[in-house]
Amino acid sequence: TSTIQFDIPLRKPHMRVATNWRVRPWIFKKITDASPAYISLLRIGNIAFIGTPCDFSGELTAAIDERANALDLDVLVTSFNGGYIGYITKDEWYNLKEYETFVMNWYGPYNGAYFVGLIQRLLEVIT
């Protein structure tokens, strides 16, 4: 059994109100509650439970599953663990004007690949 928890470095938050209009980071912080941003991992045998501080898109798990299988691990990624930093979706959807990708994606583009990379690296660390 092993456990890991670490803070995730993130960009400054913003909220998009139109395609080229964003609420400044200092205003975002004034109108929202601060939330911890960390990833946690619990490994029991060959099962790894990964906790994320976001609404983590299921579309991102294929690459994580592939890495876990190569390491002979089964993995379960969960959302809303310990904090909330908005939606983390596939990077290609960042500019899509939908609720999850436009309104609730608070930390800019490329977080899908960023989170997948962090989780894949965590899986390597625990094997």
Question: Predicted regions span which residues?
Answer:
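Non-catalytic substrate/cofactor recognition surfaces at enzyme active-site rims
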Residues: T1-T127
